């Protein structure tokens, strides 16, 4: 069995190399064509439909060789080899280093702060030690009751 995947429409065709007239096509040990066919080719359809499996063509002598088909269809895949992985690791180390340097320099700056209202202290006049309490209402809980 040979594979022809150089079709314009992207289809995958299997070619049975035999001199026999009657051929049976099998996929994963299951019959996919009748034994009376004389087609030496079998169309698996488009390669994007992922035509995986073990294919065989058997003649009347029941001798065949199998062919395993496996298409790896990946649109956005990256080939991971040693150089790619080393590039990822190097880029990660450099970015962490630059981030650490940036945080160090920004955190180490002593900039001029704007004073806020909460930073100002209210000073007591005339050097008083204590500030007198403000007037308050006497409610029912401010006095003890006599029984």
UniProtKB/Swiss-Prot annotation:
Cytoplasmic face of the membrane: 107-147
Stretches assigned to the Extracellular side: 1-85
GO MF annotations in UniProt: transmembrane signaling receptor activity
Residue ranges of the TM segments: 86-106
UniProt-annotated glycosylation sites, renumbered to this chain: 62
Disulfide bonds: 16-57
ITAM domain sequence ranges: 119-147
Keywords: Adaptive immunity, Cell membrane, Disulfide bond, Glycoprotein, Immunity, Immunoglobulin domain, Membrane, Phosphoprotein, Receptor, Transmembrane, Transmembrane helix
Main localisation: membrane
Domain Ig-like: 7-64
Membrane topology label: Single-pass type I membrane protein
PTM text: Phosphorylated on Tyr residues after T-cell receptor triggering by LCK in association with CD4/CD8. Phosphorylated also by PKC; leading to the TCR complex down-regulation.
Modified residues (Phosphoserine): 115, 118
Sequence motif Di-leucine motif, residues: 123-124
Free-text comment about domains: A di-leucine motif and a tyrosine-based motif are individually sufficient to induce both endocytosis and delivery to lysosomes.
Known role: Part of the TCR-CD3 complex present on T-lymphocyte cell surface that plays an essential role in adaptive immune response. When antigen presenting cells (APCs) activate T-cell receptor (TCR), TCR-mediated signals are transmitted across the cell membrane by the CD3 chains CD3D, CD3E, CD3G and CD3Z. All CD3 chains contain immunoreceptor tyrosine-based activation motifs (ITAMs) in their cytoplasmic domain. Upon TCR engagement, these motifs become phosphorylated by Src family protein tyrosine kinases LCK and FYN, resulting in the activation of downstream signaling pathways.
Listed name of the protein: T-cell surface glycoprotein CD3 gamma chain
Gene of this entry: CD3G
């Amino acid at each position: 069995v040979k594979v022809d995947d150089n079709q314009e429409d992207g289809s995958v065709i299997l070619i049975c190399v035999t001199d026999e007239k009657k051929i049976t096509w099998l996929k994963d040990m299951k019959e996919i064509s009748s034994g009376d066919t004389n087609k030496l080719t079998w169309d698996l359809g488009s390669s994007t439909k992922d035509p995986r499996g073990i294919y065989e063509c058997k003649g009347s002598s029941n001798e065949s060789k199998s062919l395993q088909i496996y298409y790896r269809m990946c649109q956005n895949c990256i080939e991971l080899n040693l150089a790619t992985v080393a590039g990822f690791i190097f880029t990660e180390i450099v970015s962490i280093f630059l981030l650490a340097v940036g945080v160090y320099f920004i955190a180490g700056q002593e900039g001029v702060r704007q004073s806020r209202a909460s930073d100002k202290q209210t000073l007591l006049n005339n050097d008083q030690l204590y500030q007198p309490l403000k007037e308050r209402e006497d409610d029912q809980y401010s006095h003890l009751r006599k029984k």
